[in-house]
Design a protein with these regions (language model features):
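C-terminal catalytic domains of large/alpha subunits in multi-subunit enzymes
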Residues: 2-230
Length: 230
């Protein structure tokens, strides 16, 4: 979605290749609220690099100065010319041009990025519970939360992160226990028959909202989506 937005193409035109070290030589995995913050940032930077390189190639095709080439909504144009090129037109055209060394490889770029500054999402939550005074059984009756995750790229996914992490947090607080036999040292909870996970019928409908305050630590203003509720 990030690449499609910046390159001005449909999401269907973007193919993500993962787990191939011939293409991506280093990666740290998807954890610790880093996917959109780290990958989104390098996709943004790579998109800008690709657009600038593409402008140079388009200038050769149009036979104009690089400064005269403009890019908007996935289309390249030049001042005073009616002809336009989209990404696919330009890719085909680039195979017919005698490209200088700085444009070798055509419409390909490699981009790395190191992020050393931490970001801190934040939020506020309120939970209403009903407690059976005789048994001590706790039922979660209502849960509401407002989270600041920085810029929200995809609200549906962020809501899903919030719901999933709330369920995870409630499960850890109320049901999940890794019990060890004191004599043998063996775990008693060897299966999901003994290790209690939260289920949908034990949880209320979550009331969630987002408060966007952009992070100054990266160009997209990203923080993270799943840390607060957990």
């Amino acid at each position: 979605q990030v690449a499609a937005d910046f390159l001005g193409v449909s999401v269907d035109a973007i193919k993500i290749i993962v787990g191939d070290t011939d293409i991506v030589k280093a990666g740290g995995g998807s954890h610790s609220g880093r996917s959109m913050r780290q990958a989104g940032t390098v996709i943004y930077l790579g998109s800008q690099d690709l657009i600038e390189k593409a402008k140079c190639i388009a200038a050769l095709f149009f036979k104009v100065d690089e400064a005269e080439v403009e890019f908007s909504d996935g289309v390249f144009s030049a001042t005073g010319l009616e002809q336009i090129l989209d990404w696919f037109d330009l890719a085909r055209a680039s195979t017919t041009l005698d490209l200088p060394a700085k444009l070798s490889g055509g419409l390909t770029i490699t981009r790395e990025n190191q992020m050393d500054v931490a970001v801190f999402p934040n939020g506020c939550a309120a939970c209403e519970v009903e407690v059976d005074p005789e048994t001590g059984f706790v039922k979660v009756a209502r849960y509401a939360a407002v989270d600041d995750v920085g810029r929200v790229i995809n609200p549906l996914i962020v809501d899903g992160q919030a719901h999933g992490s709330i369920a995870q947090g409630l499960g850890q607080a109320l049901w999940e226990q890794c019990i060890i036999d004191p004599d043998s040292g063996q775990p008693i909870c060897g299966s999901l028959m003994d290790y209690t996970l939260p289920r949908a019928d034990e949880l209320p409908m979550f009331e969630t909202a987002l408060n966007e305050v952009l992070s100054p630590t990266n160009p997209l203003g990203i923080k993270s989506g799943g840390e607060g509720p957990t």
